[in-house]
């Protein structure tokens, strides 16, 4: 039986998570991409605590964007999560693309977070 895209994504994500882990010094920037929205969280895996988060569902972003499923929306989320992380003193993270290919919306989010000051 052929594997579906979702199964392939889960398999890639498990493989990535074996190698990528967030610490208090260098937390993990996790990205979840759905068909209509994108979500980003900065996570300390040791304490199992989310330090900062942003998504296209937030009222200020939702009103200013025409759709949550564009590269423009992803860049806005990347900038916002980076600003919230920097406000809490987080400058360096490890990037967890969530099994998604590093292309399009995921790449736009990562580039915007880098431009806003996060290092990874």
UniProtKB/Swiss-Prot annotation:
Q: GO molecular-function annotation terms?
A: 5S rRNA binding; structural constituent of ribosome
Whose protein is this, by species? Crocosphaera subtropica (strain ATCC 51142 / BH68)
InterPro entries given in the database record: Ribosomal_uL18_bac-type, Ribosomal_uL18_bac/euk
The UniProt entry's GO biological process terms, in alphabetical order, are: translation
Q: Is Thylakoid there in the keyword field? A: no
Question: Which residue ranges are recorded for the region named Disordered?
Answer: 1-22
HAMAP family referenced in this protein's UniProt entry, alphabetically: Ribosomal_uL18_B
Q: What cellular component terms from Gene Ontology apply here?
A: cytosolic large ribosomal subunit
- What do we know about how this protein assembles, alone or with others? Part of the 50S ribosomal subunit; part of the 5S rRNA/L5/L18/L25 subcomplex. Contacts the 5S and 23S rRNAs.
Name the protein family.
Answer: Belongs to the universal ribosomal protein uL18 family.
Domain of life, per the record? Bacteria
- Key words, A-Z: Ribonucleoprotein, Ribosomal protein, RNA-binding, rRNA-binding
Provide ranges: composition bias, Basic residues: 8-20
Q: Does the keyword Ubl conjugation apply?
A: no
* Family matches, as CDD domains: Ribosomal_L18_L5e (cd00432)
What the protein does? This is one of the proteins that bind and probably mediate the attachment of the 5S RNA into the large ribosomal subunit, where it forms part of the central protuberance.
Q: Which NCBIfam families has this protein been placed in?
A: L18_bact
Task: From the record, give the transmembrane residue ranges.
Answer: none
Task: Indicate what this protein is called per its UniProt record.
Answer: Large ribosomal subunit protein uL18
């Amino acid at each position: 039986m052929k594997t579906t895209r979702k199964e392939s994504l889960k398999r890639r994500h498990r493989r990535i998570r074996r190698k990528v882990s967030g610490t208090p010094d260098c937390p993990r920037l996790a990205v979840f991409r759905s068909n209509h929205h994108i979500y980003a969280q900065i996570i300390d895996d040791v304490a199992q605590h989310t330090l900062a988060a942003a998504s296209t569902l937030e009222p200020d972003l939702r009103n200013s964007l025409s759709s949550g499923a564009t590269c423009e929306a992803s860049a806005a989320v990347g900038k916002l999560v980076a600003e919230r992380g920097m406000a809490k003193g987080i400058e360096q993270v490890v990037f967890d693309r969530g099994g998604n290919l590093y292309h399009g919306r995921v790449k736009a989010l990562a580039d915007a977070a880098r431009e806003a000051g996060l290092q990874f």
